[in-house]
Swiss-Prot record:
Family, as annotated: Belongs to the cytochrome P450 family.
Origin species: Rhodopseudomonas palustris (strain ATCC BAA-98 / CGA009)
Transmembrane annotation, as ranges: none
UniProt binding sites for substrate: R94, P95, P96, S97, S247
PANTHER family given in the database record: CYTOCHROME P450 YJIB-RELATED (PTHR46696:SF1), P450, PUTATIVE (EUROFUNG)-RELATED (PTHR46696)
Documented EC number(s): 1.14.99.15
The protein, known as: Cytochrome p450 CYP199A2
Main location as per UniProt: cytoplasm
Length: 412
Protein backbone atom coordinates (compact mmCIF):
# COMPACT_ATOMS: atom_id res chain seq x y z
CA UNK A 1 0.00 0.00 0.00
CA UNK A 2 1.10 3.56 -0.60
CA UNK A 3 1.12 6.25 2.02
CA UNK A 4 -0.41 9.61 1.25
CA UNK A 5 2.22 12.22 0.42
CA UNK A 6 2.55 15.29 2.57
CA UNK A 7 0.60 18.21 1.16
CA UNK A 8 1.12 21.44 3.07
CA UNK A 9 0.98 25.15 2.23
CA UNK A 10 4.25 27.05 2.09
CA UNK A 11 4.88 30.74 2.55
CA UNK A 12 7.75 31.29 0.13
CA UNK A 13 7.31 30.50 -3.56
CA UNK A 14 9.96 28.36 -5.23
CA UNK A 15 11.95 29.00 -8.34
CA UNK A 16 10.87 26.81 -11.25
CA UNK A 17 11.83 23.26 -10.39
CA UNK A 18 14.05 24.14 -7.43
CA UNK A 19 14.92 21.15 -5.29
CA UNK A 20 13.45 18.46 -7.55
CA UNK A 21 15.06 16.29 -10.24
CA UNK A 22 15.07 17.88 -13.70
CA UNK A 23 14.44 15.51 -16.60
CA UNK A 24 14.71 15.92 -20.36
CA UNK A 25 11.87 13.49 -21.12
CA UNK A 26 9.27 14.78 -23.59
CA UNK A 27 5.97 12.99 -22.87
CA UNK A 28 4.51 14.45 -26.08
CA UNK A 29 7.12 13.05 -28.47
CA UNK A 30 6.17 10.35 -30.97
CA UNK A 31 8.86 7.96 -29.76
CA UNK A 32 7.52 8.34 -26.22
CA UNK A 33 3.99 7.55 -27.43
CA UNK A 34 5.26 4.43 -29.21
CA UNK A 35 6.65 2.96 -25.96
CA UNK A 36 6.12 5.10 -22.85
CA UNK A 37 6.93 2.45 -20.26
CA UNK A 38 10.74 2.79 -19.94
CA UNK A 39 10.50 6.54 -19.53
CA UNK A 40 7.57 6.23 -17.15
CA UNK A 41 9.78 4.05 -14.96
CA UNK A 42 12.50 6.71 -15.17
CA UNK A 43 9.97 9.33 -14.10
CA UNK A 44 8.82 7.25 -11.12
CA UNK A 45 12.31 6.36 -9.99
CA UNK A 46 13.62 9.94 -10.27
CA UNK A 47 11.41 11.02 -7.37
CA UNK A 48 7.85 11.71 -6.26
CA UNK A 49 7.91 15.10 -8.00
CA UNK A 50 10.06 15.97 -11.04
CA UNK A 51 10.49 18.96 -13.34
CA UNK A 52 10.23 18.53 -17.11
CA UNK A 53 12.50 21.10 -18.71
CA UNK A 54 11.10 20.62 -22.21
CA UNK A 55 7.76 22.19 -21.26
CA UNK A 56 8.60 23.90 -17.94
CA UNK A 57 6.11 21.89 -15.92
CA UNK A 58 6.21 19.76 -12.80
CA UNK A 59 5.39 16.07 -13.17
CA UNK A 60 4.06 13.37 -10.85
CA UNK A 61 4.28 9.77 -12.05
CA UNK A 62 3.88 7.72 -8.86
CA UNK A 63 0.44 6.59 -7.75
CA UNK A 64 0.43 8.35 -4.36
CA UNK A 65 1.19 11.80 -5.76
CA UNK A 66 -1.13 11.43 -8.76
CA UNK A 67 -3.94 10.40 -6.42
CA UNK A 68 -3.18 13.31 -4.07
CA UNK A 69 -3.27 15.87 -6.88
CA UNK A 70 -6.48 14.45 -8.34
CA UNK A 71 -8.18 14.61 -4.96
CA UNK A 72 -7.26 18.17 -3.99
CA UNK A 73 -9.07 20.35 -6.56
CA UNK A 74 -8.82 23.45 -4.36
CA UNK A 75 -5.01 23.38 -4.57
CA UNK A 76 -4.62 21.79 -8.00
CA UNK A 77 -7.32 23.42 -10.10
CA UNK A 78 -8.84 22.52 -13.46
CA UNK A 79 -10.36 25.90 -14.34
CA UNK A 80 -7.03 27.15 -15.71
CA UNK A 81 -7.06 24.24 -18.17
CA UNK A 82 -6.31 20.53 -17.88
CA UNK A 83 -3.82 20.77 -20.74
CA UNK A 84 -0.55 22.64 -21.07
CA UNK A 85 -2.28 25.94 -21.88
CA UNK A 86 -2.95 28.17 -18.86
CA UNK A 87 -6.35 29.80 -19.34
CA UNK A 88 -5.27 32.65 -17.05
CA UNK A 89 -2.60 33.55 -19.59
CA UNK A 90 -3.96 32.21 -22.90
CA UNK A 91 -7.35 32.23 -24.58
CA UNK A 92 -8.83 28.70 -24.72
CA UNK A 93 -9.25 27.24 -28.21
CA UNK A 94 -12.96 26.69 -27.46
CA UNK A 95 -15.33 27.76 -24.65
CA UNK A 96 -14.07 25.85 -21.60
CA UNK A 97 -15.87 22.71 -20.47
CA UNK A 98 -18.27 23.23 -17.56
CA UNK A 99 -17.20 19.81 -16.27
CA UNK A 100 -13.58 19.08 -17.15
CA UNK A 101 -12.31 22.65 -16.95
CA UNK A 102 -14.24 23.87 -13.91
CA UNK A 103 -13.67 23.84 -10.15
CA UNK A 104 -16.03 23.48 -7.19
CA UNK A 105 -18.49 24.98 -6.42
CA UNK A 106 -19.36 25.75 -10.07
CA UNK A 107 -18.32 22.23 -11.08
CA UNK A 108 -20.42 20.70 -8.30
CA UNK A 109 -23.63 22.19 -9.71
CA UNK A 110 -23.11 21.15 -13.34
CA UNK A 111 -21.69 17.76 -12.43
CA UNK A 112 -24.79 17.02 -10.35
CA UNK A 113 -26.94 17.41 -13.46
CA UNK A 114 -24.87 14.94 -15.48
CA UNK A 115 -24.84 12.53 -12.55
CA UNK A 116 -28.65 12.54 -12.60
CA UNK A 117 -28.77 12.02 -16.38
CA UNK A 118 -26.20 9.20 -16.24
CA UNK A 119 -27.46 7.58 -13.06
CA UNK A 120 -27.04 3.89 -12.18
CA UNK A 121 -30.79 3.55 -12.77
CA UNK A 122 -30.33 4.90 -16.31
CA UNK A 123 -27.54 2.40 -16.95
CA UNK A 124 -29.77 -0.41 -15.69
CA UNK A 125 -32.50 0.68 -18.10
CA UNK A 126 -30.06 0.70 -21.02
CA UNK A 127 -28.34 -2.55 -20.14
CA UNK A 128 -30.51 -5.07 -21.99
CA UNK A 129 -30.49 -3.06 -25.22
CA UNK A 130 -26.74 -2.48 -25.06
CA UNK A 131 -26.13 -6.18 -24.36
CA UNK A 132 -28.34 -7.27 -27.25
CA UNK A 133 -26.47 -4.90 -29.57
CA UNK A 134 -23.15 -6.34 -28.39
CA UNK A 135 -24.35 -9.89 -29.06
CA UNK A 136 -25.55 -8.87 -32.52
CA UNK A 137 -22.24 -7.18 -33.30
CA UNK A 138 -20.18 -10.26 -32.37
CA UNK A 139 -22.56 -12.51 -34.34
CA UNK A 140 -22.15 -10.23 -37.36
CA UNK A 141 -18.35 -10.29 -37.13
CA UNK A 142 -18.28 -14.09 -36.82
CA UNK A 143 -20.65 -14.41 -39.79
CA UNK A 144 -18.13 -12.43 -41.84
CA UNK A 145 -15.49 -15.05 -41.06
CA UNK A 146 -14.06 -13.44 -37.94
CA UNK A 147 -11.09 -11.83 -39.68
CA UNK A 148 -11.60 -8.23 -38.62
CA UNK A 149 -9.99 -4.99 -37.59
CA UNK A 150 -10.67 -4.89 -33.86
CA UNK A 151 -10.67 -1.09 -33.89
CA UNK A 152 -12.85 -0.10 -36.86
CA UNK A 153 -15.09 -3.17 -36.79
CA UNK A 154 -15.62 -3.49 -33.02
CA UNK A 155 -14.08 -0.91 -30.66
CA UNK A 156 -15.39 1.97 -32.77
CA UNK A 157 -18.35 0.34 -34.51
CA UNK A 158 -20.09 -0.93 -31.38
CA UNK A 159 -20.11 2.32 -29.36
CA UNK A 160 -21.12 4.24 -32.48
CA UNK A 161 -24.07 1.87 -32.86
CA UNK A 162 -25.47 2.53 -29.37
CA UNK A 163 -24.15 5.74 -27.79
CA UNK A 164 -25.35 8.32 -30.37
CA UNK A 165 -28.84 6.81 -30.15
CA UNK A 166 -28.73 7.05 -26.35
CA UNK A 167 -27.67 10.68 -26.72
CA UNK A 168 -30.56 11.35 -29.10
CA UNK A 169 -28.38 12.40 -32.04
CA UNK A 170 -29.53 12.48 -35.64
CA UNK A 171 -28.15 9.82 -37.99
CA UNK A 172 -26.41 12.28 -40.30
CA UNK A 173 -22.94 13.45 -39.41
CA UNK A 174 -22.04 10.91 -36.75
CA UNK A 175 -18.71 10.33 -38.49
CA UNK A 176 -17.63 13.63 -36.91
CA UNK A 177 -17.82 12.29 -33.36
CA UNK A 178 -14.53 10.38 -33.18
CA UNK A 179 -12.44 13.07 -34.93
CA UNK A 180 -13.93 15.63 -32.55
CA UNK A 181 -12.99 13.56 -29.50
CA UNK A 182 -9.48 13.09 -30.89
CA UNK A 183 -9.24 16.85 -31.40
CA UNK A 184 -10.26 17.59 -27.81
CA UNK A 185 -7.61 15.30 -26.38
CA UNK A 186 -4.88 16.45 -28.77
CA UNK A 187 -5.62 20.04 -27.75
CA UNK A 188 -4.56 19.30 -24.16
CA UNK A 189 -1.00 18.88 -25.38
CA UNK A 190 1.67 21.40 -26.38
CA UNK A 191 1.64 23.31 -29.69
CA UNK A 192 3.13 20.36 -31.57
CA UNK A 193 2.19 18.92 -34.95
CA UNK A 194 -0.52 16.70 -33.46
CA UNK A 195 -2.28 19.62 -31.80
CA UNK A 196 -1.87 22.07 -34.64
CA UNK A 197 -3.05 19.69 -37.37
CA UNK A 198 -6.03 18.57 -35.29
CA UNK A 199 -7.17 22.15 -34.75
CA UNK A 200 -6.59 23.07 -38.40
CA UNK A 201 -8.84 20.20 -39.54
CA UNK A 202 -11.44 20.78 -36.84
CA UNK A 203 -13.89 23.25 -38.37
CA UNK A 204 -16.45 20.71 -39.70
CA UNK A 205 -16.23 18.59 -36.54
CA UNK A 206 -16.72 21.59 -34.27
CA UNK A 207 -19.62 22.86 -36.37
CA UNK A 208 -21.34 19.47 -36.26
CA UNK A 209 -20.96 19.13 -32.50
CA UNK A 210 -22.13 22.70 -31.84
CA UNK A 211 -25.25 22.06 -33.93
CA UNK A 212 -26.01 18.69 -32.33
CA UNK A 213 -25.85 20.20 -28.85
CA UNK A 214 -28.81 22.48 -29.52
CA UNK A 215 -32.12 21.41 -28.03
CA UNK A 216 -34.18 21.20 -31.26
CA UNK A 217 -31.70 18.70 -32.74
CA UNK A 218 -31.87 16.19 -29.87
CA UNK A 219 -34.47 13.41 -29.80
CA UNK A 220 -36.86 13.30 -26.83
CA UNK A 221 -35.82 10.89 -24.08
CA UNK A 222 -32.12 10.88 -24.96
CA UNK A 223 -29.30 12.05 -22.70
CA UNK A 224 -29.10 15.36 -24.57
CA UNK A 225 -32.79 16.20 -24.16
CA UNK A 226 -32.61 15.22 -20.49
CA UNK A 227 -29.74 17.65 -19.95
CA UNK A 228 -31.70 20.47 -21.59
CA UNK A 229 -34.71 19.64 -19.40
CA UNK A 230 -32.70 20.67 -16.35
CA UNK A 231 -32.56 24.20 -17.76
CA UNK A 232 -36.36 24.29 -17.39
CA UNK A 233 -36.02 23.63 -13.64
CA UNK A 234 -33.33 26.25 -13.16
CA UNK A 235 -30.60 23.79 -12.15
CA UNK A 236 -28.60 24.96 -15.16
CA UNK A 237 -29.10 27.86 -17.55
CA UNK A 238 -30.21 27.47 -21.19
CA UNK A 239 -26.73 28.66 -22.18
CA UNK A 240 -25.04 25.97 -20.08
CA UNK A 241 -27.10 23.07 -21.42
CA UNK A 242 -25.42 22.82 -24.86
CA UNK A 243 -21.97 22.89 -23.23
CA UNK A 244 -22.94 20.00 -20.96
CA UNK A 245 -24.20 18.02 -23.95
CA UNK A 246 -20.85 18.75 -25.61
CA UNK A 247 -18.99 17.41 -22.57
CA UNK A 248 -20.89 14.15 -22.76
CA UNK A 249 -20.36 13.76 -26.51
CA UNK A 250 -16.59 13.48 -26.03
CA UNK A 251 -16.48 11.91 -22.55
CA UNK A 252 -19.05 9.25 -23.40
CA UNK A 253 -17.40 8.00 -26.57
CA UNK A 254 -13.60 8.24 -26.52
CA UNK A 255 -13.24 6.50 -23.15
CA UNK A 256 -15.41 3.65 -24.40
CA UNK A 257 -13.73 3.21 -27.78
CA UNK A 258 -10.24 3.20 -26.32
CA UNK A 259 -11.26 1.07 -23.35
CA UNK A 260 -12.80 -1.64 -25.55
CA UNK A 261 -9.80 -1.52 -27.88
CA UNK A 262 -7.45 -1.94 -24.92
CA UNK A 263 -9.45 -4.88 -23.58
CA UNK A 264 -9.58 -6.75 -26.89
CA UNK A 265 -5.85 -6.14 -27.40
CA UNK A 266 -5.13 -7.50 -23.91
CA UNK A 267 -7.28 -10.60 -24.38
CA UNK A 268 -5.60 -11.30 -27.73
CA UNK A 269 -2.13 -10.98 -26.19
CA UNK A 270 -2.93 -13.00 -23.08
CA UNK A 271 -4.93 -16.07 -24.18
CA UNK A 272 -4.81 -17.59 -20.69
CA UNK A 273 -6.76 -14.60 -19.41
CA UNK A 274 -9.30 -14.95 -22.21
CA UNK A 275 -9.67 -18.62 -21.24
CA UNK A 276 -10.41 -17.52 -17.66
CA UNK A 277 -13.00 -15.08 -18.97
CA UNK A 278 -14.63 -17.75 -21.13
CA UNK A 279 -14.82 -20.04 -18.11
CA UNK A 280 -16.47 -17.28 -16.07
CA UNK A 281 -18.09 -14.52 -18.17
CA UNK A 282 -19.09 -12.73 -14.96
CA UNK A 283 -15.48 -11.50 -14.91
CA UNK A 284 -16.21 -9.31 -17.96
CA UNK A 285 -16.57 -6.11 -15.93
CA UNK A 286 -13.29 -6.68 -14.11
CA UNK A 287 -11.52 -7.71 -17.32
CA UNK A 288 -12.51 -4.33 -18.75
CA UNK A 289 -11.37 -2.46 -15.61
CA UNK A 290 -8.03 -4.25 -15.65
CA UNK A 291 -7.54 -3.33 -19.31
CA UNK A 292 -8.18 0.32 -18.46
CA UNK A 293 -5.58 0.08 -15.68
CA UNK A 294 -3.10 -1.87 -17.79
CA UNK A 295 -3.30 0.23 -20.96
CA UNK A 296 -4.58 3.52 -19.46
CA UNK A 297 -6.25 4.97 -22.58
CA UNK A 298 -6.14 8.42 -20.94
CA UNK A 299 -2.44 8.82 -20.20
CA UNK A 300 -2.08 12.33 -18.78
CA UNK A 301 -3.86 15.42 -17.51
CA UNK A 302 -2.62 18.72 -16.13
CA UNK A 303 -3.61 20.75 -13.11
CA UNK A 304 -2.52 24.28 -12.06
CA UNK A 305 -1.54 25.21 -8.51
CA UNK A 306 -3.76 27.83 -6.86
CA UNK A 307 -1.24 28.56 -4.10
CA UNK A 308 2.28 27.77 -3.03
CA UNK A 309 2.26 24.17 -1.84
CA UNK A 310 4.57 21.42 -0.68
CA UNK A 311 3.93 18.04 -2.28
CA UNK A 312 5.93 15.03 -1.08
CA UNK A 313 8.70 17.33 0.11
CA UNK A 314 8.83 19.39 -3.08
CA UNK A 315 7.93 23.07 -2.98
CA UNK A 316 5.75 24.19 -5.90
CA UNK A 317 4.82 27.83 -6.38
CA UNK A 318 1.39 29.24 -7.22
CA UNK A 319 0.41 29.17 -10.89
CA UNK A 320 2.58 26.19 -11.87
CA UNK A 321 1.40 23.48 -14.23
CA UNK A 322 1.56 19.94 -12.82
CA UNK A 323 1.41 17.02 -15.27
CA UNK A 324 -0.15 13.86 -13.85
CA UNK A 325 0.98 10.61 -15.49
CA UNK A 326 -2.15 8.49 -15.01
CA UNK A 327 -0.75 5.60 -17.05
CA UNK A 328 2.41 5.54 -14.96
CA UNK A 329 0.43 5.63 -11.70
CA UNK A 330 -1.55 2.63 -12.91
CA UNK A 331 1.70 0.68 -13.29
CA UNK A 332 3.43 1.90 -10.15
CA UNK A 333 4.84 -1.13 -8.26
CA UNK A 334 4.47 0.87 -5.04
CA UNK A 335 0.70 0.48 -5.48
CA UNK A 336 0.21 -2.63 -7.63
CA UNK A 337 1.65 -6.13 -7.31
CA UNK A 338 3.21 -7.26 -10.60
CA UNK A 339 1.84 -4.15 -12.35
CA UNK A 340 3.01 -5.13 -15.84
CA UNK A 341 0.82 -8.24 -15.84
CA UNK A 342 -2.74 -8.24 -17.17
CA UNK A 343 -4.80 -10.15 -14.60
CA UNK A 344 -8.60 -10.18 -14.95
CA UNK A 345 -9.02 -11.23 -11.30
CA UNK A 346 -6.93 -8.35 -9.94
CA UNK A 347 -8.57 -6.02 -7.41
CA UNK A 348 -8.62 -2.97 -9.68
CA UNK A 349 -10.39 -0.60 -7.30
CA UNK A 350 -8.48 2.66 -7.05
CA UNK A 351 -6.99 2.69 -10.54
CA UNK A 352 -6.90 6.19 -12.02
CA UNK A 353 -7.73 5.21 -15.60
CA UNK A 354 -10.96 7.20 -15.26
CA UNK A 355 -9.39 9.75 -12.94
CA UNK A 356 -10.33 10.09 -9.27
CA UNK A 357 -12.20 12.49 -7.03
CA UNK A 358 -14.66 15.14 -8.18
CA UNK A 359 -13.36 15.10 -11.76
CA UNK A 360 -13.62 11.34 -12.29
CA UNK A 361 -14.62 10.72 -15.92
CA UNK A 362 -18.24 11.70 -16.42
CA UNK A 363 -18.67 8.98 -19.06
CA UNK A 364 -17.31 6.17 -16.91
CA UNK A 365 -20.64 4.41 -16.29
CA UNK A 366 -21.38 4.34 -20.02
CA UNK A 367 -17.88 3.09 -20.80
CA UNK A 368 -18.05 0.40 -18.14
CA UNK A 369 -21.46 -0.82 -19.29
CA UNK A 370 -20.44 -1.01 -22.94
CA UNK A 371 -17.08 -2.58 -22.12
CA UNK A 372 -18.66 -5.22 -19.93
CA UNK A 373 -21.34 -6.31 -22.40
CA UNK A 374 -18.85 -6.51 -25.30
CA UNK A 375 -16.42 -8.67 -23.32
CA UNK A 376 -19.25 -10.85 -22.04
CA UNK A 377 -20.44 -11.40 -25.62
CA UNK A 378 -16.91 -12.32 -26.71
CA UNK A 379 -16.61 -14.75 -23.78
CA UNK A 380 -19.82 -16.55 -24.73
CA UNK A 381 -19.47 -16.59 -28.50
CA UNK A 382 -15.74 -16.71 -29.28
CA UNK A 383 -13.28 -19.55 -28.60
CA UNK A 384 -10.09 -17.68 -29.44
CA UNK A 385 -8.87 -14.16 -30.26
CA UNK A 386 -5.61 -14.09 -32.20
CA UNK A 387 -3.62 -11.16 -33.55
CA UNK A 388 -3.60 -11.58 -37.33
CA UNK A 389 -1.27 -8.83 -38.51
CA UNK A 390 0.80 -5.82 -37.46
CA UNK A 391 -0.99 -3.26 -35.34
CA UNK A 392 -0.88 0.48 -35.97
CA UNK A 393 -0.90 3.00 -33.14
CA UNK A 394 -2.96 6.18 -33.16
CA UNK A 395 -0.83 8.94 -31.70
CA UNK A 396 -2.56 11.55 -29.56
CA UNK A 397 -1.24 14.02 -27.00
CA UNK A 398 -3.43 12.54 -24.25
CA UNK A 399 -4.88 9.22 -25.42
CA UNK A 400 -3.06 5.92 -25.88
CA UNK A 401 -4.88 3.89 -28.47
CA UNK A 402 -4.74 1.94 -31.70
CA UNK A 403 -5.56 2.93 -35.26
CA UNK A 404 -5.74 -0.66 -36.46
CA UNK A 405 -5.52 -4.15 -34.91
CA UNK A 406 -6.11 -7.10 -37.26
CA UNK A 407 -7.47 -10.08 -35.33
CA UNK A 408 -9.03 -13.46 -36.02
CA UNK A 409 -12.08 -14.46 -34.00
CA UNK A 410 -12.72 -18.20 -33.83
CA UNK A 411 -16.36 -19.06 -33.06
CA UNK A 412 -17.11 -21.07 -29.95
Amino acid sequence: MTTAPSLVPVTTPSQHGAGVPHLGIDPFALDYFADPYPEQETLREAGPVVYLDKWNVYGVARYAEVYAVLNDPLTFCSSRGVGLSDFKKEKPWRPPSLILEADPPAHTRTRAVLSKVLSPATMKRLRDGFAAAADAKIDELLARGGNIDAIADLAEAYPLSVFPDAMGLKQEGRENLLPYAGLVFNAFGPPNELRQSAIERSAPHQAYVAEQCQRPNLAPGGFGACIHAFSDTGEITPEEAPLLVRSLLSAGLDTTVNGIAAAVYCLARFPDEFARLRADPSLARNAFEEAVRFESPVQTFFRTTTRDVELAGATIGEGEKVLMFLGSANRDPRRWDDPDRYDITRKTSGHVGFGSGVHMCVGQLVARLEGEVVLAALARKVAAIEIAGPLKRRFNNTLRGLESLPIQLTPA
